[in-house]
């Protein structure tokens, strides 16, 4: 499902990730463990295409994240440590916006958004502005956007 080969990320003279290689199989759960500054979030950001690697490759379901980003990203749902939420949108507006970004077909959008919102128990918050939600509800909105479209892989960075 995911293959990482000789992944490197350098920021000037600092090497954040140094020749990392691994494979992630479908249907299994994996985790990165390490101290602060070990490169866990940087690795996840490279896997998801948020930042480019200095060297190495990331392939998701046969698609290189840099050469075929749209195809690769269709396979991934990503919840970064700080979810990219728009505070001046309601929960429902935001979820519809994400559905459009993910190119969810119009005939499935309404039902899929409703289903995902119910899964993470935010349906009652759908008309509230995101800026007025508690941190816990904001995290749920972030999780909902990650699983919208039912991607094959969900990547969670500091999901608690």
Where are these regions (language model features)?
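Conserved catalytic motifs of ABC-family nucleotide-binding domains
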Residues: 150
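Walker A (P-loop) phosphate-binding loop of ABC-type ATPase nucleotide-binding domains
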Residues: 35-39
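Conserved ABC ATPase signature
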Residues: 129-133
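Conserved ABC transporter NBD signature motif
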Residues: 56-67, 71-72, 76
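Catalytic Walker B motif of ABC-type/P-loop ATPase nucleotide-binding domains
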Residues: 154-157
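Conserved ABC ATPase "signature" region
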Residues: 96, 100, 107-125
């Amino acid at each position: 499902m995911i293959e990482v080969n000789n992944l490197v990320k350098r920021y000037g003279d600092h090497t954040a990730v140094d020749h990392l290689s691994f494979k992630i199989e479908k249907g299994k759960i994996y985790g990165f463990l390490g101290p602060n500054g070990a490169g866990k979030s940087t690795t996840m950001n490279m896997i998801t295409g948020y930042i480019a690697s200095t060297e190495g490759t990331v392939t998701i379901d046969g698609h290189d994240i840099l050469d075929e980003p749209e195809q690769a990203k269709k396979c991934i749902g990503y919840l970064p440590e700080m979810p990219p939420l728009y505070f001046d949108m309601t929960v429902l507006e935001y979820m519809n916006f994400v559905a459009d970004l993910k190119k969810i077909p119009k005939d499935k959008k309404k039902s899929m958004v409703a289903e995902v919102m119910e899964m993470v128990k935010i349906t009652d918050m759908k008309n509230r502005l995101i800026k007025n939600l508690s941190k816990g509800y904001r995290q749920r909105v972030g999780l909902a956007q990650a699983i919208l479209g039912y991607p094959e892989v969900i990547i969670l960075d500091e999901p608690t």
